[in-house]
Amino acid sequence: MINPKIDPSWLEVLRPQFEAPYFAQLKDFLVAERQQYVCYPKGGDIFAAFDRTPFDKVKVVILGQDPYHEPGQAHGLCFSVPAGVAVPPSLVNIIKEINSDLGTQIPLTSGNLTGWAEQGVLLLNATLTVRAHQAGSHQHRGWELFTDAAIQALAQRRTGIVFMLWGSFAISKAQYIDRTRHYVLTAPHPSPLSAYRGFFGCRHFSQCNAILQQQGLAPIDWTRIS
């Protein structure tokens, strides 16, 4: 993480975080973790969300909690998996809701959301790394301070962003967002445990595009999953 792979716009915004004492401690923790354990995603993908979606191009924010923790899944974008990897259950439910909401026929066989990121959808996990096979193993080590700062920077310096917050953890981040400047859509988490409690039928994808078009912005092509 000496030279993080991150878009220059975000590097400028997040420079105070990279230089903060907590981040030095986080780096030391990650070095020690990688000496003992396999960690995901690989180093070059840790900041992929910030690299794929420049600060001034963010139109939509989707928040996750932490990366997938099994081999080959995590590549730095929340909910997303590389092409050719089995689509995880939460993402299957996200695709089902898009198809229901928009009348699309996106197959449930691919889950790479890079095409969303390239259109201005920031796919941000609150914690950017994880130990293999141990969900949540890198929580409360400093990543949340870092990603909260990113959310706050967007909330304060930009206007008109659509924040799609699914589940109680993501919804807790609404405290950083001024709803007179931005749009906040909330629903239960798309996990199989909670999707039937209101994620299915939330119609966030059509709502998001309507909001963007009201602002004269291009809608997101949610079918761009590879």
Residue ranges: model-predicted function:
Residues 2-14:
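Generic N-terminal amphipathic, Lys/Arg-enriched alpha-helix
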